[in-house]
């Protein structure tokens, strides 16, 4: 068996489709009991990691992902925005930290980052880390060199989802291959960063495709440290705007099976949460979800606001996880970040609405 042990449970990388389908087929209570038992062996069951996601460059993406309102191929009414100024990103990061987030995720609607944008991206990473927060980015596909530069700047996590099963993937995206995604994850690992990778359910896939997605994730050489499970957010103007709703229990089953297959990973209750009532969210936490995105938007789609999240946490006895860092270390990093900012050359900060002379921005 291809496995190693963590917390008393074997971390497997050799799942078969029939095994995963058997988990999905368990009676609901049995499935949740198994998932919760495994969850408690690896995590505090009443602690949830809280992240904030900011779109640092919005819209005009050349890809054709059928679920995505940021694709330039679909008319969704989304207002495109250029790459944000570094200081504006830091303002949002400070707000996120004050509201309880321990991780700040930055997303750009690109096929892949351009060289002209890399200095600003690297500066964002360094400055946000200086606030004492974990950093995560999703910028599209990466070369090995780009991944190495992000890692050297201190990026903690890189998000690149597999989206769905290899078999269903071609029904959703044609502008990049499944192997392209796997290659990017390999580059991220090679650069020493942690992997955030999951998928979207409710896109018209079959049950075997949800099983296939989780199998692809769990059979990676190393499990992703973070596994976001997204419910499709149907946006008018995208090809999936009229897709039928996925059964709520099927979504909860997906969370539970992800927890069983990847025991030591954070399973994130991600997009689509705004449409879930409190009871469904509570069942997802029982099934093993222990991470959420926090705030009013997930890139370009709605998300529950901070107050409703904290009220639900209080009712459930859940508390936000804190980054393992001493207060004096955070204070020291803040001072160093402020000194660095004051001494930085002006050209590192720019108005994203006014391209710098001689530089075209996408």
Curated annotation (Swiss-Prot):
Record the organism. Aeromonas salmonicida (strain A449)
Q: Which domain of life is it from?
A: Bacteria
Q: Which UniProt keywords apply?
A: 2Fe-2S, 4Fe-4S, Biotin biosynthesis, Iron, Iron-sulfur, Metal-binding, S-adenosyl-L-methionine, Transferase
Known HAMAP family for this protein? BioB
Q: Which reaction does it catalyse?
A: (4R,5S)-dethiobiotin + (sulfur carrier)-SH + 2 reduced [2Fe-2S]-[ferredoxin] + 2 S-adenosyl-L-methionine = (sulfur carrier)-H + biotin + 2 5'-deoxyadenosine + 2 L-methionine + 2 oxidized [2Fe-2S]-[ferredoxin]
Which cofactors are named for this entry?
[4Fe-4S] cluster; [2Fe-2S] cluster
Ranges for the Radical SAM core domain? Answer: 46-273
Instruction: Specify whether Oxidoreductase is a keyword of the entry.
Output: no
Q: Annotated Gene Ontology MF terms?
A: 2 iron, 2 sulfur cluster binding; 4 iron, 4 sulfur cluster binding; biotin synthase activity; iron ion binding
Q: Does the keyword Nucleotide-binding apply?
A: no
The EC number(s) given in the record are 2.8.1.6
Q: What class of enzyme is it?
A: transferase
Subunit composition and interactions: Homodimer.
Which GO biological process annotations does it have? Answer: biotin biosynthetic process
Q: Which Pfam families does this chain map to?
A: BATS, Radical_SAM
**Stated name of the protein:** Biotin synthase
**Where is the organism placed in the taxonomic lineage, from the top?**
Bacteria, Pseudomonadati, Pseudomonadota, Gammaproteobacteria, Aeromonadales
Cofactor binding: number and manner: Binds 1 [4Fe-4S] cluster. The cluster is coordinated with 3 cysteines and an exchangeable S-adenosyl-L-methionine. Binds 1 [2Fe-2S] cluster. The cluster is coordinated with 3 cysteines and 1 arginine.
- PANTHER family in UniProt: BIOTIN SYNTHASE, BIOTIN SYNTHASE, MITOCHONDRIAL
Binding of [2Fe-2S] cluster, residues? 105, 136, 196, 268
Positions of [4Fe-4S] cluster binding: 61, 65, 68
Q: What does this protein's UniProt record list under function?
A: Catalyzes the conversion of dethiobiotin (DTB) to biotin by the insertion of a sulfur atom into dethiobiotin via a radical-based mechanism.
Mind telling me which SMART domains this protein's record contains? BATS, Elp3
């Amino acid at each position: 068996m291809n496995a190693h042990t963590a917390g008393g449970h074997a971390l497997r990388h050799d799942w078969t489709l029939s095994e995963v389908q058997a988990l999905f087929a368990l009676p609901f209570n049995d499935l949740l009991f198994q998932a919760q038992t495994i969850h408690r062996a690896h995590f505090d069951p009443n602690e949830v990691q809280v992240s904030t996601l900011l779109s640092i460059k919005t819209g005009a993406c050349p890809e054709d992902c059928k679920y995505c309102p940021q694709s330039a191929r679909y008319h969704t009414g989304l207002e495109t925005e250029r790459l944000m100024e570094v200081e504006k990103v830091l303002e949002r990061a400070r707000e996120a930290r004050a509201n309880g987030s321990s991780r700040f995720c930055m997303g750009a609607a690109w096929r892949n980052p351009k060289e002209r944008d890399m200095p600003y991206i690297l500066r964002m990473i360094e400055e946000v880390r200086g606030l004492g927060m974990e950093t995560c980015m999703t910028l599209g596909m990466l070369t090995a060199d780009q991944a190495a530069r992000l890692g050297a700047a201190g990026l903690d996590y890189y998000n690149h989802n597999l989206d769905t099963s290899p078999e269903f993937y071609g029904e959703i995206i044609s502008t990049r291959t499944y192997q392209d995604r796997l290659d990017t994850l390999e580059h991220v690992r090679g650069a020493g960063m942690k992997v955030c990778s999951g998928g979207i359910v409710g896109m018209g896939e079959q049950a075997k495709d949800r099983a296939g997605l989780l199998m692809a994730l769990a059979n990676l050489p190393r499990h992703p440290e973070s596994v976001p499970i997204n419910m499709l957010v149907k946006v008018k103007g995208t090809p999936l705007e009229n897709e039928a709703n996925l059964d709520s229990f099927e979504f909860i089953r997906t969370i539970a099976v992800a927890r069983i297959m990847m025991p030591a990973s954070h399973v994130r209750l991600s997009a689509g949460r705004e449409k879930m009532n409190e009871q469904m969210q509570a069942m997802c936490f029982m099934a093993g979800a222990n991470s959420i995105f926090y705030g009013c938007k997930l890139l370009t789609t709605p998300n529950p606001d901070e107050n409703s999240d904290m009220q639900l946490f209080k009712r459930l006895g859940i508390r936000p996880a804190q980054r393992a860092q001493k207060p004096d270390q955070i204070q020291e990093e803040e001072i160093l970040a402020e000194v660095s900012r004051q001494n930085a050359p002006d050209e590192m900060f720019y108005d994203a609405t006014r391209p710098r002379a001689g530089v075209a921005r996408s």
